[in-house]
């Protein structure tokens, strides 16, 4: 299912294609969030966007009137003690009062903490979408600090990088290509990239050409 919307200029827009182009056409050479290169999967009714530098998965839905960005935190509250949940909800409400555009909500049977923002499809352009993405990421990092979850999300980021390296090895990437990925995409220095790659390949007993 493809959603076509008439934008402010009166032309038809396939938002899946347009947003995917915005997220994948960067160069990873600037600080601008819209210059980051995202891995985007098109699930027809929504997009899934991931970046090795970001410990969150983004889900981007579109309808005839709005584009919705949802950031999944993976933090479920359904099984927590009532006082714990009350404290979390209070902190989320206080965070919502500090931020514009984006809002934290509880979603699903697991009562997961997610962040969402709705954008008017009729007037949306790349700059507004980029501002919304920046707002989402800023709000998420505010939550991490508020809940003191730095270690948890650093581990998630490390796990994501390890998984990406394993996927690239399975696809036949060379050691040089893996090092280039760690240095240019992740932003590591050469020595750190080599140490991490050695650790990954030794742990999972890959072939000698990766070591």
Where are these regions (language model features)?
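Charge-rich, low-complexity N-terminal segments
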Residues: 2-53, 178
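A short acidic-to-branched-hydrophobic micro-motif
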Residues: 56-78
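Short Lys/Arg-enriched helix C-cap and helix-to-coil transition segments
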Residues: 205-211
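Short, surface-exposed recognition loops or helix-turn segments adjacent to catalytic cores
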Residues: 37, 105-107, 145-159
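Ampiphathic alpha-helical segments that act as solvent-exposed interaction surfaces
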Residues: 87-99, 119-151
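Short, aliphatic-rich beta-strand segments
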Residues: 113-118
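Short, internal acidic amphipathic alpha-helical interface segments
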Residues: 72-112
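Acidic, Ser/Thr-rich low-complexity intrinsically disordered segments
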Residues: 154-204
């Amino acid at each position: 299912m493809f959603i076509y919307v008439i934008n402010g200029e009166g032309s038809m827009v396939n938002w899946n294609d347009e947003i995917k182009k915005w997220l994948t056409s960067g160069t990873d050479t600037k600080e601008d969030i819209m210059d980051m290169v995202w891995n985007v999967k098109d699930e027809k009714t929504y997009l899934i966007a991931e970046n090795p530098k970001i410990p969150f998965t983004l889900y981007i839905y579109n309808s005839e009137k709005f584009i919705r960005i949802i950031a999944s935190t993976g933090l479920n509250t359904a099984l927590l003690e009532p006082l714990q949940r009350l404290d979390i909800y209070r902190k989320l409400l206080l965070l919502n009062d500090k931020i514009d555009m984006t809002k934290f909500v509880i979603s699903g049977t697991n009562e997961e903490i997610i962040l969402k923002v709705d954008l008017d499809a009729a007037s949306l352009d790349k700059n507004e979408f980029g501002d919304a993405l920046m707002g989402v990421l800023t709000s998420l990092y505010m939550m991490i600090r508020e809940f003191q979850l730095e270690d948890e999300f650093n581990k998630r980021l490390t796990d994501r990088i390890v998984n990406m390296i394993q996927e690239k090895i399975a696809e036949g990437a060379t050691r040089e290509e893996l090092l280039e990925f760690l240095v240019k995409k992740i932003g590591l220095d050469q020595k750190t990239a080599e140490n991490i790659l050695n650790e990954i390949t030794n742990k999972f007993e890959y072939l000698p050409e990766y070591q």
